[in-house]
Amino acid sequence: IENQELLRRALSRSPKCRLILSAHDFHGPFEDITALHRRILTVCPSAIPKLVYTAKHINDCFEAFDLLHRTSGERIVFCMGESGVISRMLAGKLGSFLTFASIDDESATAPGQLTIRKFKELYRGDSVNSEMSLFGVIADPVAHSLSPAIHNACFADAKMNSLYLPLLVKGGSAGFDSFMRNIIRRKWLEFKGLSVTIPHKEDALKFVKANGGRVEPLAEKIGAANTLLITEHGGLHAFNTDYASALDAITAGMGISRADLCDLSVAVVGAGGVARAIVAALSDAGAKIIIYNRTIEKAQRLAAEFGCDWAGPDELPSL
């Protein structure tokens, strides 16, 4: 930008040449991304602005999304870092002129850059468009999750114009609440549903209740939700599918019926969201449950809630 006259002379000699004017911040979001975008176009109206910054939290991505949503023309806007990965995946939906991918993991030129194969095959890069509905799994960590691979393969097979994203939401309940508010107030992102896993299942239930959403009875009983439905008008419905899944997995693995769980002695290790669903399911089936957890207080609270026994991890029988 400091060499405006030099740029003008160079472009005048090559009228078919387009200029990309870039600004990067490797430390965090720009102080004023809108003003920076305007400044680039003021200096060189024919240029393609490229604005790239590091997202320290997934919530930092929304500044980039907002700029793409409220501006037109050719521009390149996305975030670097593991928290900014979804901004690369959504380039096609939000109208970014281009995004970047690497040949392989070793060839990545910036943190958070996807490989070409992962971008095209796992995240349907060639099919992403402005009308696409969005889904995703909220977790911390999330990179290990198979949910994007499973759901995106199903979407492609069913010819559904949908994309399932890995949503790394750090910062406990505060980070979760902020993320949910960000997507709900931006209906144009078209988020339709979310899977929720560790450590946010209890956060999900609390958020839906606090914001006037509908909670299915099973999720209310368990005190955790692993599935959120977002209605057309931004309403929320919370569900818990862990209860039925746990019973099906346990009975199938043991080759027994649900009725056979009655009076069966069962050790449950953990006292988080999944453990709550398993304890609720086994309790309803009549099993005799002992909850083992490193944090004794959490084991005590869960045991008291469902009428179970509890113990510390040092008392867990060797398996």
Where are these regions (language model features)?
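Catalytic alpha/beta core domains of metabolic enzymes, predominantly
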Residues: E2-S133
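Residues at the starts of beta-strands that form the adenosine-phosphate
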Residues: R18, E74, S265, A287-I290
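Short, solvent-exposed amphipathic alpha-helices that sit
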Residues: L36, L146-F155, G273, A277, ...
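Glycine-rich adenosine-cofactor-binding loop
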Residues: C79, L134-V142, A238-Y243, I250, ...
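Phosphate/diphosphate ligand-binding glycine-rich loop within oxidoreductases
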Residues: M132-I256
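NAD(P)-binding Rossmann-fold cofactor-contacting core
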Residues: A285-F306
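Short acidic low-complexity segments
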Residues: F306-L319
